Amino acid sequence: MNNDRSTRKKLVALTFDDGPNTTTTNEVLDVLEKHGVVASFFLVGNNINSESAISVKRAYDLGCEINNHSRSHGYMDKMTAGEIKAEYGFVDEKVFEITGEHTKFFRPPYIAVGGLMWENISVPFISGLGCGDWDDNVTVERRVDVITEGVRDGSVILLHDAEGNRKTVEAVDKIIPALKEQGYKFVTVSGLFKAKGIAPVTKMIYSNALQKGMWG
């Protein structure tokens, strides 16, 4: 067991799905910069274009991690092996073109996982502590409360930077200082596993770096 002091720090990883775009993604980045923290972005390939790629590069240059959320955001548990590889590979290639790095983690759309996905995507899968923030009916206050009350050391926080999701931008601006007050530090998903001395494995879907079972 790794008893290094860094493994005993309270750490969380903010993550954002469904970008990139030139509006909400940049608003989230503004909040991250304001508070001096990093996050990880799980991109939908069909949203990557010459303009939104600038937001991706900005995130990367700020120290954020860029990961994979499929090309089309379809139900990949119902896809063939070839379709699954194409969904993952498209985003991985686009991210490499922008950042010079391959994606290290995959978040399955709808957290829907089937056997062929395990066999055809060779990186660890990531879920996370969510608050239903894809639903505009969920208030800013509810988003903040669910995250700040549910978070634990090692948590991956699952949020969305889809275009127009202003309530999550407002919520993140409150979540970050609230968790700092609780003693949490913010890292990327890769940084979370590294700091905890854990090597993430495939055929697992992590919502917390410290979980023991396949689903946490």
Where do the protein language model's features map onto the residues?
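C-terminal accessory extensions appended to soluble enzyme cores
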Residues: A199-G216
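Catalytic domains of cell-wall/extracellular-matrix polysaccharide-remodeling enzymes
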Residues: E27, S50, R58-D61, R71-K185, ...
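Active-site beta->alpha N-cap acidic-glycine motif
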Residues: M1-D77, E83-I84, F90, K94, ...
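A generic signature of intrinsically disordered, low-complexity regions enriched in glycine/proline
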Residues: R8, N21-T22, N137, N165, ...
